[in-house]
UniProtKB/Swiss-Prot annotation:
Domain of life: Eukaryota
Name of the featured protein: NAD(P)H-quinone oxidoreductase subunit 3, chloroplastic
Keywords: Chloroplast, Membrane, NAD, NADP, Plastid, Plastoquinone, Quinone, Thylakoid, Translocase, Transmembrane, Transmembrane helix, Transport
Biological source species: Citrus sinensis (Sweet orange)
InterPro entries associated with the record: NAD(P)H_OxRDtase_bac/plastid, NADH_UbQ/plastoQ_OxRdtase_su3, NDAH_ubi_oxred_su3_sf
Amino acid sequence: MFLLYKYDIFWAFLIISSVIPILAFLISAVLAPINKGPEKLSSYESGIEPMGDAWLQFRIRYYMFALVFVVFDVETVFLYPWAMSFDVLGVPVFIEAFIFMLILIVGLVYAWRKGALEWS
């Protein structure tokens, strides 16, 4: 009970970091114009009037390529701290990272065989 003063800065930061986004959303909701005209309902294409049908369906290949990119981007995020602290952590963590890499390589081979990496 006597050591709770250590967490005062944490609670202050938590409250402030929660209140600021809520206030930003509330202020924008109050100040934003509500009128919906033809300009608001039209599609936006880099400031140019849309030509033809603005609703275009993307091929699933783009989504698969993005998904594979995200998976290996997350892999990099996990492997970087491991590589920086490899000398401190020792062999057991090396084995865990090796298993992690093995699982990701199996996933890469699976995506490759399914054709998720083929662009054409």
